């Protein structure tokens, strides 16, 4: 699907369809008023007859409106004008895309980007429209024999901006939106892939392909179990002992800033391609969804793709910590004591608290890069789902400015996060009689104690932890990976690169 931006009046548009908004109760948006005027009140007469109230989600497709050059006009209900916020704006765009796709409108000029969304500029509205359109049209059908496609799918969308001065920011918004959407799609595709296909070796192959596609700025190194043993990554290795699939850590390095002094931002993704729970095995109900336990690694991969596509002038390293947690004769056990790469020892009380064991060694490994900041992304705890539900990602950090940056980026991108504390009081829950720490701290504050565990391996740099257990995928009829928090991290890196969307 193609996107472009232009500046023009609605009466001059020769298009298959023009898209304009209508507010409650039966109030035309400024652009719709212009079309109504040139059509001698045709549109307002329809509204007076009760054809459209303007409630969110309502649509009315008009054909051959008098004096209008376009073949059709699509009226979209936007709700009450003063209540149009970011969430409702994206829902309006989603409804628009679905309606155009279902009605065979192969191209359209969209004036919805001229609607007023409080605190948001045209760059934001165009970029969010692109990202929402791509999200709406996403489907995972690679493994289906019969693929359903619309007879006349939407192929081209033109966004209208009020003045020619805003064309440049509109074009940049499309460029950024497409790159972020492609990163989200890549993350969703990886997340949705079944575990008999997507194992640690598959993650490594995707990382290598990324380096091949962007070879001027990206290199990938894959570290196998033999090298992990030499490095002393015993906690990481222990988690994968029960699986016949080798644990592999893929390190993707992007160099956009040639300066010797430019320190990288490191992203670490938990990549448990299937988590049975190990010896502390999970209940069978819903266990199929444990293929999504690698969505942290999938998100990091998607972000690295975005960075390479936009050639951001910063250095970023993405680590995909690939592994599989299975029961078996070689599997690690409750009661085992593991010596981590940092030298600290961990008593295993539950083999289903495995993600932190993988991550702790990776967080030690990345010290060698002397990072500007390290952000790990993990479907880490069910406790975070209880705390924040399925709408907001949990954030913990040992550095207030980094936490504030990430929270700001989450609001900008509409991919929200909420900060949880990392107090010393919670560290006490990790005490062990037999090792430096236990790998679980009991039920109270489970998401926080998991973050506290990781914080013990991050004392040499600024670090943040994103717990995406509640936001990485959906269950039920709409089951599938969400691609979060690709948008949040993309915005964070765009801000670091000087593209904050404030033009």
From Swiss-Prot:
GO terms for MF: manganese ion binding; metalloaminopeptidase activity
Reactions accelerated catalytically: Release of an N-terminal amino acid, Xaa-|-Yaa-, in which Xaa is preferably Leu, but may be other amino acids including Pro although not Arg or Lys, and Yaa may be Pro. Amino acid amides and methyl esters are also readily hydrolyzed, but rates on arylamides are exceedingly low; Release of an N-terminal amino acid, preferentially leucine, but not glutamic or aspartic acids
Protein name, UniProt field: Probable cytosol aminopeptidase
Primary location: cytoplasm
Taxonomic lineage of the native organism: Bacteria, Pseudomonadati, Pseudomonadota, Gammaproteobacteria, Enterobacterales
UniProt cross-references to InterPro entries, sorted A to Z: Leucine_aapep/pepB, Macro_dom-like, Peptidase_M17_C, Peptidase_M17_leu_NH2_pept, Peptidase_M17_N
Species of origin: Salmonella arizonae (strain ATCC BAA-731 / CDC346-86 / RSK2980)
Any single GO BP term: proteolysis
Gene name tied to this protein: pepA
Top enzyme class: hydrolase
Residues noted as binding Mn(2+) 1 in the record, renumbered to the chain: 275, 352, 354
Entry keyword set: Aminopeptidase, Cytoplasm, Hydrolase, Manganese, Metal-binding, Protease
Chain's role: Presumably involved in the processing and regular turnover of intracellular proteins. Catalyzes the removal of unsubstituted N-terminal amino acids from various peptides.
GO cellular component, one term: cytoplasm
E.C. no: 3.4.11.1, 3.4.11.10
Chain segments annotated as transmembrane: none
Domain of life, per lineage: Bacteria
PROSITE patterns recorded: CYTOSOL_AP (PS00631)
Cofactor list: Mn(2+)
